[in-house]
C-alpha cells in the first residue's frame, strides 16, 4: 500500500531571486546555488521525468530504482528507492538534489543538509503546481528556455482538453488508489483535479484529505458511473482486486461495464506526462468527444 501511495505523491508556488541564485522550495526552505546545477540527483520518478523534459541527460548523475522513464533514466546510477542511500548520493558529488516531500524522510533530508548538499523539495497539490515545477527546475539548472517551451506545449494541450470538456456532463468517478484499506483521492490531491479536468466528478471529492480512507458502503451509496484502476509494473491495482468489484452489481459502473484501467505513471506521477494522463482520462470518460478519424 505504501508504494502505491508514494508513487502518487511525488509541487506549491516557488519564489526565486536569480541574481543571488537563492531559491525557496515548497517546504519554504531557502536553497542557495553558487551556480546553475551541473550534477543533479533525483529522488523521485516524477522529478527525473522533469529533469529530462527540460533537456538534461548527462547532468543527471543519480536516480532512484523506481525511475524508469525516459529510457535513459534506467542507465543512471541508483541511489536507493524511497529511502535514499546517503553514501551513494555523496559519492556522486551532486551540486543539487531534487526530491519530493513524500519521497524523502525528514531525517534523510536533515542529513543531506548537514552534508551541505543543496536539496530542493517539490510538493504538488494541483496540475498547475506541476507545470510550475517544470519552470522551477528549468531555472535551477539554467534551462529556462527549454522549460518555458515544455510548459507552454503542455498548457496548450490542457486548454484543448478544457475546450472539449466545457459542454459535457461530468461522470461520477471513483479512483481506486488501494483496496485494503480502501483509499481514493480527495480535494487535496492533484489527481482529484485531473479527474475534474477530464470531465469527471470525483465521488469523494468533497473530502479535504489528499488520499482519504473510504468505506465500501459509502462508495456503493454514491454509485459511481466509472471505476478507475491504476495499473503498472511499479504500482497499481492487481487484476484480481479489480474483478472483485464486479460482484457489486448495483453499481452503475458495474452494470454498464465501465471498469477502466489507466497507466499509473500517467496519473500518479506529477511530472510532464500528467497532461497525457488528463487526455487519457478524458477519452475514457467521454469517448464521443474524441471521434476516431477515418482514412479516405
Residue ranges and their predicted role:
Residues 6-9:
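N-terminal export leaders
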Residues 37, 84-102, 117, 215-232:
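Proline-aspartate-enriched helix->loop->beta-strand connector
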Residues 56, 74-75, 115-116, 198, ...:
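Short, structured coil segments at secondary-structure junctions
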Residues 64, 188-211, 229-231, 261:
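His/Asp/Glu-enriched short active-site or ligand-binding loop at hydrolase and phosphoryl-transfer sites
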Residues 104-114, 226-244:
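A ligand-binding cleft/hinge motif common to bilobed small-molecule-binding domains
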